[in-house]
Amino acid sequence: MPPSGPRAALFLLPSLLLLRAVLAVPLERGAPKEENPATESPDTGLYYHRYLQEVINVLETDGHFREKLQAANAEDIKSGKLSRELDFVSHHVRTKLDELKRQEVSRLRMLLKAKMDAQQEPNIQLDHLNLLKQFEHLDPQNQHTFEARDLELLIQTATRDLAQYDAAHHEEFKRYEMLKEHERRRYLESLGEEQRKEAERKLEEQQRRHREHPKVNVPGSQAQLKEVWEELDGLDPNRFNPKTFFILHDINSDGVLDEQELEALFTKELEKVYDPKNEDDDMREMEEERLRMREHVMKNVDTNQDRLVTLEEFLASTQRKEFGDTGEGWEQGKAGVPLPMAPVLTLQTVEMHPAYTEEELRRFEEELAAREAELNAKAQRLSQETEALGRSQGRLEAQKRELQQAVLQMEQRKQQQQSHNNPAPGPEGQLKFHPDTDDVPVPAPAGDQKDVDASEKKVPEQTPEPPQLDSQHL
């Protein structure tokens, strides 16, 4: 069972209306009980859950507001009369509430900016004031302080949103069931005749097993509560006492039975039909039946419709004639249609009594076909774009290879030129010098060589000049 406590009960209910029951003085017990450790409030599923929780936590610290809340009735809370008491809370509490609102406005602005950035082009000026108007749980005209109008809007919005939570759950389950049936029919169409008959036989066998189980009692009836009293509480069924039963199952001792505490009472009945160890049993169907059972009890027992069952409401329900009627058991009918607390016909599971009509299934299949066609078209476009990118990549790779080949050829030619201009060293490392061909004398032809030799022979020898006499010797 999920955690429950004063704040846990609060967040399962539509608004601050629940605070009155949460803060009520607990029933006297024979022996004092140790205080249960504080548990975190379960998530309501609202996108402003944290803001709602923090506002309530702050308001709980103010003695004046707490006193007015205990004296208020449901109409005072829903009409906004309680919200006006915010003007009399302490300055310290108002300061905390102002800071909470500024943080919430900042958070919503960030969400809006992220959303707009994902949908629009950059550099577009946003009108945050108009955008904040789509959030109905705060006053967008005043973005800095928490006023009575903010508390009123928070109560109204949470009341509406949480009241629609069960309806949204039923709609989600309906779509889940239609998708299952759609896939089952498509699977049967893909089979041969013999295989299809075998699959249909297995389905009929599964449905037959669901019909063969112990009787499921009407939720909230004497028979159902006595079974819990005997099998879960281990007490004598002949000594059943409604007040004692209420106290035993008020787990957090806050004087009321919240939705989670009520749903825990139906586990024994649901286990008669659904076995978690059996793969053929759909646990989502079991939880849908649990929700329907809780709605049925709330409709017949919760007279002020605050989604809490007080001791007075519980005891009053046990005085009705229907409380002792046995009938044939609980009928599991269409999802979201609570049945009256009265004798009903034989049990029908969700599989035997679908949560949808054939017309709804037809429209759902048309919606799936349109979505599938859209996805196929998108997949085809992506495939074509992928092929185009592949071809472009191939061309780029070819150009890259050509460029690399050209660079390689240029390097080779450069190396060849350098090796031609620079002689290679000899075996002992010395350079081999090759004289320039322009400085080497060209030998004359053989005939000319004789003339050259003869001319050399005809050259007369030069006679030495006579010595000159010095003038001093004369």
Swiss-Prot record:
Using the record's annotations, give every residue carrying the modification Phosphothreonine. T145
What's a BP term from Gene Ontology annotated to this protein? small GTPase-mediated signal transduction
Coiled-coil region list = 147-215, 355-422
- Give the Phosphoserine positions (modified residues): S83, S383, S471
The UniProt record lists the EF-hand domain at 237-272, 289-324
A Pfam family for this UniProt protein?
Answer: NUCB1_N
The Basic and acidic residues compositionally biased stretches are: 190-207, 448-460
The record lists Ca(2+) 2 as bound by D302, N304, D306, E313
Q: Which is an annotated GO molecular function term of this record? A: G-protein alpha-subunit binding
What membrane topology is given?
A: Peripheral membrane protein
- What positions does the entry give for Ca(2+) 1 binding? D250, N252, D254, E261
Q: Provide the tissue specificity.
A: Expressed in bone where it is detected in the soft tissue in the center of the osteon and in the osteocyte lacuna (at protein level).
Stretch list, region Binds to GNAI2 and GNAI3: 225-318
Give the location in the cell.
Golgi apparatus, cis-Golgi network membrane; Cytoplasm; Secreted
Q: What does this protein do?
A: Major calcium-binding protein of the Golgi which may have a role in calcium homeostasis. Acts as a non-receptor guanine nucleotide exchange factor which binds to and activates alpha subunits of guanine nucleotide-binding proteins (G proteins).
| Recorded family membership | Belongs to the nucleobindin family.
Q: What is this protein called?
A: Nucleobindin-1
According to its UniProt entry, this protein's organism is Bos taurus
